[in-house]
Amino acid sequence: MDKQKVCVIGLGFVGSAMATAIAISKSNNRPVYDVVGIDLDNKQGNERVNLINCGEFPFSTNDNHLKSAFKHAIRQGNLKATTDKSVCSDADIIIVDIQLDIDYLNNEPQLEFDQFKNAISEIGRLIAPETLVIIETTVPPGTCEKVVVPTLESELNLRGLSIDNVLIAHSYERVMPGNEYLASITDYWRVFSGYTKIAADACEVFLSNVIN
Protein backbone atom coordinates (compact mmCIF):
# COMPACT_ATOMS: atom_id res chain seq x y z
CA MET A 1 0.00 0.00 0.00
CA ASP A 2 1.31 3.45 -0.91
CA LYS A 3 2.20 5.72 1.98
CA GLN A 4 0.00 8.76 2.54
CA LYS A 5 1.69 12.14 2.30
CA VAL A 6 1.55 14.33 5.40
CA CYS A 7 2.62 17.98 5.41
CA VAL A 8 3.44 19.52 8.79
CA ILE A 9 3.24 23.31 8.56
CA GLY A 10 5.40 25.04 11.16
CA LEU A 11 8.75 23.56 12.17
CA GLY A 12 9.05 24.93 15.67
CA PHE A 13 9.84 22.43 18.40
CA VAL A 14 6.31 21.02 18.42
CA GLY A 15 6.07 20.77 14.64
CA SER A 16 9.51 19.19 14.28
CA ALA A 17 8.77 16.64 17.01
CA MET A 18 5.32 15.90 15.57
CA ALA A 19 6.81 15.41 12.11
CA THR A 20 9.21 12.90 13.65
CA ALA A 21 6.42 11.07 15.48
CA ILE A 22 4.42 10.78 12.25
CA ALA A 23 7.44 9.61 10.25
CA ILE A 24 8.22 6.74 12.64
CA SER A 25 4.61 5.47 12.60
CA LYS A 26 4.51 1.92 11.26
CA SER A 27 2.02 -0.70 10.14
CA ASN A 28 3.24 -4.25 9.56
CA ASN A 29 6.74 -2.89 10.26
CA ARG A 30 6.50 -0.44 7.36
CA PRO A 31 6.24 3.37 7.53
CA VAL A 32 2.65 4.57 7.15
CA TYR A 33 3.42 8.12 6.01
CA ASP A 34 5.76 10.20 3.90
CA VAL A 35 6.28 13.41 5.87
CA VAL A 36 7.24 16.85 4.61
CA GLY A 37 7.86 19.63 7.12
CA ILE A 38 7.21 23.15 5.87
CA ASP A 39 8.49 26.42 7.30
CA LEU A 40 8.66 30.06 6.25
CA ASP A 41 11.08 31.11 3.54
CA ASN A 42 13.10 33.34 5.84
CA LYS A 43 16.43 33.03 7.66
CA GLN A 44 15.06 31.06 10.59
CA GLY A 45 12.87 28.84 8.43
CA ASN A 46 15.66 28.05 5.98
CA GLU A 47 18.01 27.19 8.85
CA ARG A 48 15.50 24.69 10.25
CA VAL A 49 14.81 23.19 6.84
CA ASN A 50 18.51 22.84 6.05
CA LEU A 51 19.26 21.20 9.40
CA ILE A 52 16.47 18.65 8.95
CA ASN A 53 17.53 17.82 5.40
CA CYS A 54 21.11 17.40 6.63
CA GLY A 55 19.94 14.92 9.26
CA GLU A 56 20.06 17.19 12.31
CA PHE A 57 17.10 17.85 14.61
CA PRO A 58 16.71 21.65 14.44
CA PHE A 59 16.54 22.25 18.20
CA SER A 60 18.60 21.34 21.22
CA THR A 61 16.93 18.57 23.23
CA ASN A 62 17.84 16.21 26.05
CA ASP A 63 15.32 13.64 24.78
CA ASN A 64 17.57 10.91 23.41
CA HIS A 65 14.57 8.96 22.11
CA LEU A 66 13.51 11.97 20.02
CA LYS A 67 17.03 12.31 18.63
CA SER A 68 17.26 8.64 17.68
CA ALA A 69 13.72 8.57 16.24
CA PHE A 70 14.51 11.59 14.09
CA LYS A 71 17.72 9.96 12.81
CA HIS A 72 15.78 6.77 12.08
CA ALA A 73 13.17 8.68 10.06
CA ILE A 74 15.89 10.40 8.05
CA ARG A 75 17.62 7.08 7.36
CA GLN A 76 14.44 5.39 6.19
CA GLY A 77 13.85 8.32 3.85
CA ASN A 78 10.32 9.42 4.73
CA LEU A 79 11.05 12.73 6.46
CA LYS A 80 12.24 15.88 4.72
CA ALA A 81 11.65 19.62 4.91
CA THR A 82 11.07 22.54 2.56
CA THR A 83 9.96 26.18 2.40
CA ASP A 84 7.94 25.46 -0.75
CA LYS A 85 4.27 25.40 0.29
CA SER A 86 3.18 24.09 -3.10
CA VAL A 87 4.00 20.59 -1.80
CA CYS A 88 0.64 20.81 0.00
CA SER A 89 -1.15 20.39 -3.33
CA ASP A 90 -0.83 16.60 -3.29
CA ALA A 91 -0.94 16.06 0.48
CA ASP A 92 -3.41 13.61 1.95
CA ILE A 93 -3.13 15.15 5.41
CA ILE A 94 -2.00 18.59 6.58
CA ILE A 95 -1.02 19.30 10.19
CA VAL A 96 -0.97 22.96 11.25
CA ASP A 97 1.59 23.62 13.99
CA ILE A 98 1.98 27.38 13.72
CA GLN A 99 2.72 29.21 16.94
CA LEU A 100 0.29 31.96 17.93
CA ASP A 101 2.12 35.00 19.29
CA ILE A 102 0.71 37.18 22.04
CA ASP A 103 1.23 40.94 21.96
CA TYR A 104 0.49 43.17 24.91
CA LEU A 105 -1.39 46.30 23.85
CA ASN A 106 -2.20 48.69 26.70
CA ASN A 107 -1.27 45.83 29.04
CA GLU A 108 -3.98 43.65 27.51
CA PRO A 109 -2.85 40.40 25.87
CA GLN A 110 -3.90 40.09 22.23
CA LEU A 111 -3.33 37.13 19.94
CA GLU A 112 -1.60 37.78 16.63
CA PHE A 113 -3.53 35.69 14.11
CA ASP A 114 -1.94 37.07 10.93
CA GLN A 115 0.64 34.32 10.35
CA PHE A 116 -1.87 31.63 11.27
CA LYS A 117 -4.57 33.03 8.97
CA ASN A 118 -2.09 33.49 6.11
CA ALA A 119 -1.14 29.83 6.38
CA ILE A 120 -4.80 28.74 6.38
CA SER A 121 -5.41 30.89 3.28
CA GLU A 122 -2.46 29.28 1.49
CA ILE A 123 -3.75 25.85 2.41
CA GLY A 124 -7.12 26.73 0.90
CA ARG A 125 -5.47 27.85 -2.32
CA LEU A 126 -3.49 24.64 -2.67
CA ILE A 127 -5.13 21.56 -1.21
CA ALA A 128 -6.90 18.87 -3.17
CA PRO A 129 -10.45 17.75 -2.36
CA GLU A 130 -10.74 15.20 0.47
CA THR A 131 -7.58 16.45 2.19
CA LEU A 132 -7.66 16.14 5.98
CA VAL A 133 -6.57 19.38 7.68
CA ILE A 134 -5.79 19.01 11.40
CA ILE A 135 -5.26 22.14 13.47
CA GLU A 136 -2.77 21.20 16.17
CA THR A 137 -1.93 24.74 17.23
CA THR A 138 -3.38 25.59 20.64
CA VAL A 139 -6.04 28.13 19.72
CA PRO A 140 -8.81 29.95 21.61
CA PRO A 141 -12.30 28.39 21.65
CA GLY A 142 -14.18 29.10 18.44
CA THR A 143 -11.09 29.54 16.26
CA CYS A 144 -11.87 26.63 13.96
CA GLU A 145 -15.45 27.76 13.33
CA LYS A 146 -14.77 31.51 13.24
CA VAL A 147 -11.34 31.65 11.59
CA VAL A 148 -10.29 28.36 10.00
CA VAL A 149 -13.53 27.33 8.29
CA PRO A 150 -14.44 30.79 6.86
CA THR A 151 -10.86 31.36 5.64
CA LEU A 152 -10.67 27.97 3.95
CA GLU A 153 -14.18 28.36 2.55
CA SER A 154 -13.34 31.71 0.97
CA GLU A 155 -10.30 30.30 -0.82
CA LEU A 156 -12.05 27.09 -1.84
CA ASN A 157 -15.00 29.01 -3.29
CA LEU A 158 -12.60 30.92 -5.55
CA ARG A 159 -11.58 27.52 -6.92
CA GLY A 160 -15.15 26.38 -7.40
CA LEU A 161 -14.92 24.01 -4.43
CA SER A 162 -17.12 23.66 -1.38
CA ILE A 163 -15.96 23.56 2.22
CA ASP A 164 -17.53 20.09 2.22
CA ASN A 165 -14.75 19.02 -0.16
CA VAL A 166 -12.18 19.04 2.67
CA LEU A 167 -12.02 17.45 6.11
CA ILE A 168 -11.30 19.83 9.00
CA ALA A 169 -10.35 18.63 12.47
CA HIS A 170 -8.76 19.94 15.64
CA SER A 171 -6.47 18.10 18.03
CA TYR A 172 -4.47 20.49 20.15
CA GLU A 173 -0.79 19.89 20.74
CA ARG A 174 -0.15 17.95 23.91
CA VAL A 175 3.52 17.95 24.78
CA MET A 176 5.64 17.86 27.91
CA PRO A 177 9.08 19.48 27.63
CA GLY A 178 11.96 17.44 28.98
CA ASN A 179 13.67 14.14 28.36
CA GLU A 180 10.44 12.38 27.35
CA TYR A 181 9.21 14.95 24.84
CA LEU A 182 8.50 12.45 22.04
CA ALA A 183 6.77 10.06 24.43
CA SER A 184 4.48 12.90 25.51
CA ILE A 185 3.22 12.92 21.90
CA THR A 186 3.11 9.20 21.16
CA ASP A 187 2.20 7.68 24.53
CA TYR A 188 -0.61 9.88 25.86
CA TRP A 189 -4.31 10.18 25.11
CA ARG A 190 -5.30 12.92 22.68
CA VAL A 191 -8.51 14.94 22.44
CA PHE A 192 -9.81 15.57 18.93
CA SER A 193 -12.89 16.82 17.14
CA GLY A 194 -14.04 17.25 13.56
CA TYR A 195 -16.06 19.85 11.70
CA THR A 196 -18.04 16.87 10.40
CA LYS A 197 -18.31 13.27 11.56
CA ILE A 198 -16.35 12.14 8.50
CA ALA A 199 -13.55 14.56 9.44
CA ALA A 200 -13.57 13.35 13.06
CA ASP A 201 -13.39 9.73 11.93
CA ALA A 202 -10.48 10.48 9.57
CA CYS A 203 -8.66 12.33 12.36
CA GLU A 204 -9.15 9.38 14.70
CA VAL A 205 -7.64 6.99 12.15
CA PHE A 206 -4.63 9.25 11.70
CA LEU A 207 -4.04 9.76 15.43
CA SER A 208 -4.45 6.03 16.05
CA ASN A 209 -1.57 5.41 13.66
CA VAL A 210 0.69 7.95 15.38
CA ILE A 211 -0.25 7.48 19.04
CA ASN A 212 0.41 4.17 20.77
Predicted regions, residues:
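NAD(P)+-binding Rossmann beta1-loop-alpha1 motif at the extreme N-terminus of oxidoreductases
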Residues: 1-58
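Structural motif
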Residues: 5, 92-93, 132
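Conserved beta-strand segments of alpha/beta enzyme cores
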Residues: 34, 78-80, 167
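A structured beta-alpha segment of the ubiquitous adenosine-cofactor-binding alpha/beta core
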Residues: 61-93, 99-102, 124
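Local beta-strand N-terminus motif with an aromatic residue
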Residues: 90-91, 130, 188
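Redox-cofactor binding/interface segments in oxidoreductases and associated redox assembly factors
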Residues: 94-96, 135, 193
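Rossmann-like NAD(P)(H) cofactor-binding subdomain of soluble oxidoreductases
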Residues: 102-174
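Internal alpha-helical scaffold of NAD(P)-dependent oxidoreductase catalytic cores
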Residues: 150-171, 175-212
